[in-house]
Amino acid sequence: MPLITPGRRWQPIYYTFHKDKWSHRFLNSIEMLYKGPLWGCRQCGNCLLQETAFICPMECPKGLRNGPCGGSTPEHCYVDETRPCIWFKIYERAFKMGRQELLMEVLPPLDWEMVGGEQLGLLFGQIRKNGTSKVISGLVSTNSEKRSSTWDGVFRPVRQPEWWQGDSEYHAPAYTEPASELERRLKAGEFVVTTEVQPPMTVSTKKLISNIDLVKPYVTAVNFTDGASATPRMSSFACSTVAVQQGAEPVLQIASRDTTRTALQSEVIGANALNIHNVLCLTGDSNALSPSPQGRMDIVDLDSIQMLWVLRRMRDEGRYLDGREIKFPPKYFIGAAASPYASRPEFQAMREHKKVNAGAQFFQTNLVFDPDRLEIWLNELVKRDVLDKVYILIGVSPLKSLKATLYMKEEVPGVFIPDSIVKRMEAADAAGNASEEGVQITLEIIEQIRHKQGVNGIHIMSVGWEEIVPRIVTEAGLLPKDFAINEATHSSEVPSGTRKSL
């Protein structure tokens, strides 16, 4: 266990992919003599200790470098319950030290040309570049601002390479016309409804098309998950392409768990060329949740905040991460996930604020079953002055059974289900009408949250129960203004009251 980082090293240290000069190897050995015992250093090649309250973020099993995942808890890491959530510890210490705003800087992904190497030489080189005497005089100055500026002048160029240049500022979209129908409706002030259609486990698209056609008239956009629970299904990209062919508005989900920086940039360029204009960036469930044999889980190439940063710059600056110009840049509406119940509300609000600064234009939250606790999280966002910079779609899900309720309560990270709801589902299960009670609970939650500050719509996660979506939207009074259905396609599924109203 390191002396300063409150958690043991997740994996062994990295080694370079090339042979270093003896001088670099010597400095590397010196670094490991003190950084290993003190912080559990893995030699990532881009030390962030000053920005992360002197706790190494590489202790995180997912290798996240910009904040916690949506399953963060005060008690433990959900990937490995024998360890603390290292990002909860970072936030906790940063708030105690008054260094929390340092966490807002969008930090770069690893440069694998630098991974395994030392940083002392880079720092010494930066000191020489800035002027050794100037740096020394600045560091011993009685002016605190000058000391801080001098210190940052040495460390920032090393921390923020030229190809990244992350900061802690908000970057408004560099366009005015909506990139998608979802963005257009949100900008127009409509209360928007989106949903999910479960990707198939086979190559057959018959049921996929049927479900898309079923929900299409009732919602503005349809999401397709990207390997939910780290379990393979048809890709979100393929499902989104089918949705476009069916005349539906897709939301392409991309999980960083399975996505390299090369794949991310290639995928959004291809998706945009195929008229997919909504992209939701997610960390993704850990491979620890996947069926055996499990895939690699010690590191992700990009975290979700880094994905947002890359996609925003591709769209607004017309450049790839490597600096190449994009002659015809993509146009898309960028979204991210939000977790109102993970960790502590003030920690989560900071995480969400950082996502907005990085490029998130809309949030789809994790499932909400407690509107009162949701209010606490929303109030924290108000304090951070971000509600006018992002649209928030609250995640709701109809509980189909008592078994599903208990599974979500006990096994799904970031989801909180009050005991009162569990008791209602237990009573309904005993009476044989659990699914109906689940629908009524969902309708009650929608009614309680729809008028809260900052709430711009709902996202219905049907979890394979797509046929319930028309009823929920109809009974909640959320039919879109241009609502119309194909009678031949929907006659067996649409609530009778809805058909009469047409």
Where are these predicted regions, by residue range?
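Iron-sulfur (Fe-S) cluster-binding modules
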Residues: M1-N46, K62, N66, G71-A174, ...
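Conserved, mostly hydrophobic/aromatic
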Residues: C69, E196, V222, A271, ...
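Active-site pocket-lining/capping segments in soluble small-molecule metabolic enzymes
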Residues: H171-A172, D298-K327, A337-A342, R384-E447, ...
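Active-site mouth loops of central-metabolism enzymes
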Residues: H171-P173, V192-K206, S229, P250-T262, ...
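Active-site-adjacent beta->alpha loops and helix N-cap segments on the catalytic face
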Residues: S204-K206, A230-T241, T260-S266, S286-L308, ...
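Catalytic cores of alpha/beta
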Residues: T259-N272, E346-V356, N379, S401-L406, ...
